[in-house]
Amino acid sequence: MMRLGVFLLLLLPTVLGIYGCSNASDYTSENPNAAFFYPLDSIPKIYLYRDVSSGLDEEFHRIYTVKDQEGPHLIVEIYASDGRIKEAFNYNIDSLNLQDYMVVDVNQEKEKALLYKDKLFPMHLNERTWFAAKFKGVVDSTVMLSEVKRQFKRKENHLVMEDEEPTLVFSDLMRLTVLNPFTKKEEAKQTTRISYFADGYGLVEWHSINKKVHYRLEQVLTQQEWIKIITR
């Protein structure tokens, strides 16, 4: 039943893309760094990332644009290797700021997070972006605050699958705080991640400082290829 539901979820943006959008050239961003962000295409693309430190763990990012009464925006859905959706980011195409952020708990219940700071991708490379969102915690009565502060480090040519591509490299300071509003107690964990955004692709690689976690883009799948994987 869950896989049928996922299949219908995957099918909907394809139908919207056919009837609601003409082609990818309909969408342009005012962000001067948009070439290094995800393609603004109404036809969904699925990025398969593999954890090269272990060679086993996979993660899928499903990327597509839609247009509604609020205008065009880009959706990035994050899936675990078993097909469970984990979170989804909704970006405004003009600025590439976040419009919405959705989280999914272990029971696959979706929650629209409360967005405090909406910048994950910079308009200008000399700015430090700040993303902050609050949502329900794993334990009853707790809430979680997720933050990412991103700083541009350098531009380089980087290997993306089999080709060298111009790439923006960022340092991401990531902080997750668990808050109990009744006891006023909080517990925070912080880490630093290095992220790589390549021209024409968007996010192609990320790793922790010690590279114990290290994901790299391995393949770009079509919608049909993705459906075969997720429903088999």
Language-model segments: what does each one mean?
Residues 1-6:
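Positively charged n-region of N-terminal signal peptides that target proteins for export
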Residues 9-10:
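Hydrophobic alpha-helical transmembrane segments of integral membrane proteins
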Residues 18-20:
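C-terminal motif of bacterial Sec signal peptides marking the signal peptidase cleavage site
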